[in-house]
A protein has these predicted regions:
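Terminal amphipathic helices with adjacent charged low-complexity linkers/tails
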Residues: 270-272, 304-410, 448-450, 592-593, ...
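Ferredoxin-type iron-sulfur electron-transfer modules in oxidoreductases and energy-metabolism complexes
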Residues: 539-712, 832-840, 884, 924-931, ...
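Flexible inter-domain linker/hinge segments
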Residues: 2-7, 67, 202-245, 509, ...
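N-terminal glycine-rich flavin-associated loop
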Residues: 22-23, 46-79, 97, 101-146, ...
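A glycine-rich phosphate-binding loop feature that marks nucleotide/adenosyl-phosphate handling sites
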Residues: 37, 87-89, 146-153, 237-240, ...
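N-terminal flexible segment immediately upstream of the FAD-binding catalytic core
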Residues: 1-72, 86-116, 145, 168, ...
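Iron-sulfur cluster-binding electron-transfer modules in prokaryotic oxidoreductases
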Residues: 522, 529, 678-1009
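C-terminal substrate-binding/cap subdomain adjacent to the FAD-binding core in PCMH-type
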Residues: 155-157, 165-168, 175-395, 431, ...
Length: 1009
């Protein structure tokens, strides 16, 4: 049994006073001081971990004013603004109050198409804005690898930039106005002002008072600023004194806020300029035999007028080849006898197709000549059009996350990852950089914006090893020396954060002026203190080796507990699971709640914190209880559960709340670049949690469902009468379940027999073994799953009819529990027992050489996932479409004329963990003469039995409304098909529409042939 875990530290009296002041002044957002929220917000996309004292989630601009005023008379309250949490240098981490604006302040307020600008709240995600204005031919240009979760407020705070910055510049180049809140509670509106306009502002106005001081600081130090700020595409930001006066000589007050990392003000809104979206695009993937050749070639490539040039080394490329994204891009990286050690991605854009084709032809001819003459590059491929090009950029954007997935205790991490030097110096700079890393015998990955002189370098360190602190210091100091030598910067695009200790060195004699800017806005040093600058040159700044590392907490975890926590221990905080896109499957609970605890990153962080606290409590491994032990200890568990309901604290309860919200859809398992698999460690947690507390009745009902249904199928009218009666619904609701589905009304074994097919009984298998080779070659055994067999028996019959019409001789394997519901709810010992018995029966058929196929993707993929994770050896049970795609031959099929257009809504688990299997449906439909389009769609919100839980009903409904419902309700031209039983039942529940399985559609087509 696990022990009760006390809170690590109680909320301080000052934080309590702050909360009271907030509530007293009408704060509309949420306030959080719980351990779970603080643990989740203690990390970002960096190597550091700082637990905040509390978190607040403001709803609007007035809330920002309220919170700074509430903190005004509490000098111990420090404020740390947070956007998307994608910063790589702990910009949003701190021990005070985190202000997370992403939950509520995420609205696009206004878009002016004619004048090409948008007004947005600070929490708007960059890609979200672009998706809204794409059809108008516009886009917000600064591009980031984290663009699907990075907020525009965060981009402004770090003056972010990325791919394409040579053409489009940094974020500051697109900021027209900023509305922010100062620590005094004043609203600070910044824009470009002429000297006359600035002088005309009243002395009492915030803009006039601050603007005149900033102008004076700039003009008094103009020469020093010019000599200090290097002439780079990625200028020295935070604070950008050089651009206080713009090229026209006007005063640009935005320049100081851009790149200030929340140390001067809380950004509320921004007016930003939009660019015309090029209508024509092409991308060259240029291959090299060495990474240095790719770097050396960059200068020549830039002379051809490319929009952007990105580079990727072989380490990143090899990791991409193992990722699901590779299926979409592998055609552009054909295998070669030569070693591929680096690539340059060279993009050309235009508004005229003919002009672009001339550029493509000219550049392609140049590359052919280089390859023929034995130059730097040896091959290239071309992607045309936005769809193909975006697929390659998606692969490039996943590079940062993919590096974290290397199979080693030493992971490539960010701390010197955004150095910037003049592009002409890049190859020499990187050569010495690599020598430094090689000297320390470190592995590393490299990728980045070669056209801008910015390369992302991630040395591999084991952050649990105390030596890593020494290496972080040693390498950073040497890299600082190198950037100085090559006239560059340590911080090229990711901001300073904890690396601010080097600011005095880079600013030199200008540093006191930088401090004067800080003092003007935040004289008490309460806004993100320790970063960029203090109000005086003597104010201490954070140091890279004095801020706690994530690995320092991880090092406390015992080996056994680390194994139980699984992939939670490898999450690097990249935040890919925070994707705003409602049509992206990861992560549905985040999209519905906007609660960072309800994300793979949040759950991984909580699992790590949980096993750390268990280790601190001298727990060496998680308990493993049999069902019998769980039952006999139930009374004691019930007492502890009643104590829990009465308010007895246990950190495990907070972790349980986050785990209970997980749909176990496994999208994270397939889509996370690190392959963080929440369902796997969630099951481990639930198994251990219920060693101390009583399981709810719903878990027992769902866990035993595969045993209940075969019995209930013998009396379907009785069962259906109960679930449809008011008393039945009341009882189920009391147990925690809602909308229980009806049984089909006929036993699947009897239905198959009535249709003229056989059961794969031992006697029949013996008969098959002795049959002719021709007959034996047609055999296939359908493995049942409880949901299809008992809730959609007609679908099982359709499966047999389709197989029969296509020339196979199918038989039905006798029903045996698969165990998936047991695994989902953490009955791990029971699951292992069920799985082992089931596997034994599967092996009997497999050893005969007869293919095994399953229908429901979630249940069928369990054999290749959960079974193997649990150490159960199991034969290959194929998804039906994979079997058909492999077995059918076009010459043996007479295609039926296509009369319908079909759209396929694939199950989350299938789409994210077996994407090629989804494409198999297209192949099968095409062989039979039918058109099938795969729809890009999010999660339906049902996920097995998740949507049937009373506690999750509303969340399930929200998830359905976000992606599935609008597509289901609006698309009346095509016939929609869904592979998942849970998906089809969700559509029936909320849209009252019957959606078929692809097999049922094929059955109709073949019946008419």
């Amino acid at each position: 049994m696990i022990p009760r875990l006390e809170s690590r530290e109680s909320v301080s009296s000052e934080i309590c006073n702050f909360f009271e002041a907030l509530l007293g002044c009408g704060f509309e957002g949420e306030i959080a001081g719980d351990d779970a929220t603080r643990a989740v917000l203690s990390t970002d996309n960096s190597i550091y971990q700082i637990t905040p004292a509390a978190a607040v989630f403001p709803k609007n601009h007035q809330d920002l004013i309220r919170l700074v005023r509430a903190a005004h008379d509490l000098p111990g309250i420090e404020i740390y603004p947070r956007g998307g949490g994608t910063g790589t240098n702990a910009q949003s981490l701190g021990k005070g109050v985190v202000v997370d604006t992403s939950r509520h302040m995420n609205q696009v307020l206004e878009v002016n198409i004619e004048e090409r600008w948008a007004r947005v709240q600070c929490g708007v995600v960059k890609d979200h804005l672009n998706s809204m204005i794409r059809d108008q031919g516009l886009f917000f240009a600064p591009d980031l690898s984290t663009s699907n979760r990075a907020t525009i407020g965060g981009m402004i705070n770090t003056d972010a930039s990325g791919q394409g910055s040579v053409k489009y510049g940094k974020t500051r180049d697109h900021v027209l106005e900023i509305k922010s809140v100062l620590l005094t509670g004043e609203t600070f509106d910044t824009r470009v002002l002429s000297d006359v306009a600035l002088d005309a502002l009243p002395e009492t106005s915030t803009e006039g008072r601050i603007g005149r001081v900033l102008r004076q600081l700039h003009d008094d130090h103009r020469d020093t600023i010019e000599s200090t700020f290097p002439r780079l595409n990625r200028c020295l930001t935070g604070y950008d004194l050089k651009h206080i006066r713009n090229d026209s000589g006007d005063i640009d007050l935005n320049s100081v806020v851009c790149g200030s990392e929340g140390t001067l003000a809380l950004i509320s809104e921004a007016k930003i300029s939009l660019e015309k979206l090029p209508t024509e695009v092409a991308l060259f993937a240029v291959q090299y035999g060495s990474f240095m050749d790719a770097l050396l070639d960059a200068r020549e490539l830039m002379s051809h007028g490319a929009t952007s040039i990105e580079t990727i080394d072989s380490k990143v490329l090899n990791l991409a080849m193992k990722d699901f994204v590779w299926d979409n891009v592998k055609a552009y990286f054909p295998e070669s006898k030569k070693v591929l050690a680096g690539i340059n991605l060279v993009e050309f854009t235009d508004f005229d197709a003919d002009r672009l084709h001339v550029k493509i032809a000219t550049f392609s001819q140049y590359l052919d000549q280089i390859a023929a003459s034995g130059g730097h590059s040896f091959a290239h491929a071309i992607a045309y059009g936005s769809t193909q090009v975006n697929q390659i950029w998606t692969m490039r954007k996943r590079a940062v996350g993919l590096l974290g997935g290397v199979a080693s205790s030493k992971k490539p991490v960010a701390f010197v990852e955004d150095t910037c030097v003049p592009p002409e110096n890049l190859a020499s700079f990187i050569g010495e950089f690599r020598d430094l890393l090689d000297h320390h015998e470190l592995e590393y990955g490299m990728f980045g914006h070669v056209d801008a002189g910015v390369l992302h370098v991630r040395p591999a360190l084991d952050l649990k090893d105390p030596k890593s602190l020494y290496l972080i210091r040693e390498i950073t100091d040497r890299v600082v020396d190198l950037t100085y030598k090559y006239h560059g910067l340590l911080w090229g695009e990711h901001g300073k954060g904890v690396r601010s200790e080097y600011a005095p060195l880079f600013f030199g004699q200008l540093y006191p002026t930088v401090c004067a800017v800080k003092a003007l806005f935040d004289p008490e040093n309460r806004l993100n203190p320790g970063k960029i600058a203090g109000p005086t040159p003597e104010t201490s700044l954070l140091k890279i080796d004095e801020v706690p590392l994530r690995g320092q907490r991880d090092s406390l975890v015992t080996d056994e507990l680390a194994i139980s926590a699984g992939t939670a221990m490898t999450c690097n905080g990249n935040g890919a699971c925070h994707n705003y896109d409602l049509d992206d499957r990861m992560c549905p609970s985040w999209k519905a709640t906007r609660d960072r605890r309800q994300t793979p990153k949040g759950r991984a962080g909580l699992m790590r914190e949980w096993v750390t606290r268990l280790s601190e409590a001298d727990v060496r491994s998680l308990p493993s209880q049999s069902v019998f032990v769980q039952l006999i200890t139930y009374p004691a568990k019930l007492v502890r559960t009643l104590q829990k309901n009465s308010g007895a604290y246990d950190f495990s309860h907070e972790v349980h709340e986050a785990m209970a919200g997980c749909l176990a859809c496994k999208s994270c398992t397939g889509q996370c670049p690190i392959k963080v698999s929440v369902p796997t460690f969630r099951s481990q947690f639930l198994h251990a949690y219920y060693s101390r507390y009583a399981r709810p009745l719903k878990d027992w009902i769902v866990g035993t469902l595969e045993y209940i249904l075969p019995v209930a199928a013998q009396i379907p009218r009785v069962y259906n009468g109960v679930v449809n009666s008011s008393i039945g619904r009341t009882i189920f609701s009391w147990c925690g379940l809602v909308d229980s589905p009806e049984l089909s009304g006929i036993d699947p074994h009897r239905a198959i027999a009535d249709a003229g097919f056989r059961l794969a009984s031992p006697s029949y298998l013996k008969e098959l073994k002795e049959s002719s080779p021709e007959r034996f070659a047609k055999q296939v055994v359908v493995v049942q799953d409880a949901f299809t067999s008992y809730f959609e028996t007609a679908l099982v019959v359709d499966v047999f009819k389709v197989l029969d019409r296509l020339g196979f001789e199918p038989t039905l394997m006798p029903f045996r529990p698969n165990g998936k519901p047991l695994h989902v709810h953490g009955f791990l010992k029971w699951f292992a027992s069920v799985g082992q018995k089931n596997a034994e029966h599967l092996w009997i058929i497999d050893k005969l050489g007869i293919p095994l196929i399953g229908v429901d993707p979630s249940m069928t993929l369990t054999y290749q996932s959960e079974y193997k994770e649990s150490g159960i050896e199991v034969p290959n049970v194929m998804l039906m479409q994979d079997f058909l795609a492999r077995s059918l031959k076009a010459e043996e099929i007479s295609p039926s004329p296509s009369t319908k257009q079909y759209k396929l809504f694939a199950h989350c688990t299938e789409a994210t963990n077996a994407s090629e299997s989804v494409k198999s449906w297209q192949k099968v439909f095409a062989l039979i003469g039918q058109r099938l389009e795969i729809e890009n769609v999010g999660c339906c919100g049902m996920a097995g039995t998740y949507g049937h839980e009373v506690a999750q009903y509303e969340t399930s409904k929200i998830i359905y409304s976000q992606s599935w419902e609008p597509k289901i309700e609006m698309d009346i031209q095509t016939e929609i098909l869904a592979t998942g039983y849970s998906c089809r039942s969700q559509v029936k529940r909320f849209s009252d529409k019957l959606v078929k399985h692809p097999i049922s559609a094929l059955s109709e087509v073949l019946a008419c042939a």
